[in-house]
Amino acid sequence: MLACLVMAALAETAYGSRSARVGLRNGALLVVAAVVVMSPWAARNAWALGGPVWTTTHGGYTLALANNDAYYDDVLNRPEGAVWTGPGQFAWFDRVNCELAGVDEIEADRRLRNEALRTMEKRPRDAVRAAVARLSRFWSLAPDAAVYARSVRVVVAVWTTPIWLALVLGLLDSRTRQAPRAVAAGMIVGLTIVHMFYWTDVRMRAPIVPAIALLAASARRGHMHRAQWVRTS
């Protein structure tokens, strides 16, 4: 969620007010408010784990889960939408669990993050391919075919399609470059960028569903206002 916070603050700074000074102030206030809210969690982690972790110690794991040799080899050369499972995944889990046995959470997070970054540096082309595949999965109309029945996927796609169309219309509306819509758009962009690199599936969209709903609803409202203007002009 830090990426959402950063993008939201930047959007508020850039588009929150016609005055650059007011926009900068509002963006700073947004950051300060977030720090105040998250401080108890960071303090708890500092006491329990020995370090002021502001979000989670799971980040290194999810980055490594999406960027390792076994994943690249097993998924990237299979048909689109392939789900990572089987011997390669099990072997990776076993290796990681053995190597990190007895290691504290913060150190394990650091090691896995560094391992993932080394893999991406070693295989940049595959890293880009994997990022594009995750982007597609993050914004997929329906969940993975390998996991869910066709009937479930059809129902989800029928529900999601009009929302996505409304979201696109909302993003194209010129008023989206104003607060609070710009902040919502910033949050969407922030989480999308994160999950191009970290492990993802459709449920990872959950934190930005309110932002998606706001922009999708604004498209309908904008259409109604334009229609009313045409009738009265």
Give the role of each language-model region:
Residues 38-59:
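Hydrophobic alpha-helical transmembrane segments in integral membrane proteins
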Residues 177, 216-233:
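A juxtamembrane structural motif centered on a specific transmembrane helix
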Residues 39-43, 144, 170-174, 187-202:
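Transmembrane-helix signature of polytopic, lipid-linked glycan biosynthesis machinery
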Residues 53-133:
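Membrane-proximal stem/loop segments at transmembrane-domain junctions that anchor or position
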Residues 3-4, 21, 25-33, 125, ...:
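Alpha-helical transmembrane segments of integral membrane proteins
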Residues 111-114, 118-184, 194:
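Membrane-interface anchor segments at the N-terminal boundary of transmembrane helices
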Residues 2-35, 220-222, 226:
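Perimembrane helix-loop-helix junctions
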